[in-house]
């Protein structure tokens, strides 16, 4: 299972036709400490560019777009009451959704670095 990253601060992992999407280290840095999150609904069909996640953090209020097309098979519902899990570095905590019927997921469009070629803030 390979982890790929988007420029908008998400990580993506595919296993057995199911794609899990979560908030990467870069996404966490962009938003700051998460205080509120609005998640997609189970069964929702997302297209590339659709709103995947609305998140309010210490640094920004952001609408994060879906990086791939697919159907929401599972939502990490715990995030609604425990949104601080999005601040975790543990992927078992900071995942957002799982998608099936996925298209638009070609690894060439994504990076193998969470910072997508940028330097980490402490390296600047």
Language-model region placement:
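Short, well-ordered turn and helix-capping elements at secondary-structure junctions
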Residues: 23-27, 50, 59, 76-79
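Short, Lys/Arg- and Gly-enriched loop/turn segments at beta-strand edges
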Residues: 56-65, 82-85
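Short glycine/proline-centered loop/turn elements that form peptide/ligand docking sites
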Residues: 40-41, 51, 58-61
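Conserved hydrophobic positions within beta-strands
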Residues: 9-11, 64, 72
């Amino acid at each position: 299972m390979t982890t790929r990253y988007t420029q908008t601060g998400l990580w993506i992992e595919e296993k057995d036709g199911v794609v899990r999407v979560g908030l990467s280290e870069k996404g966490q840095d962009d938003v700051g400490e998460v205080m509120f999150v609005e998640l997609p609904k189970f069964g929702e069909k997302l297209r590339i560019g659709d709103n995947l996640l609305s998140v309010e953090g210490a640094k920004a209020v952001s609408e994060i777009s879906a990086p791939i097309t697919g159907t929401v098979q599972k939502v990490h519902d715990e995030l609604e009451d425990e949104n601080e899990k999005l601040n975790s570095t543990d992927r078992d905590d900071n995942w957002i959704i799982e998608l099936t019927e996925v298209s638009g997921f070609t690894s060439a469009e994504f990076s193998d670095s969470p910072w997508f070629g940028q330097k980490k803030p402490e390296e600047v």
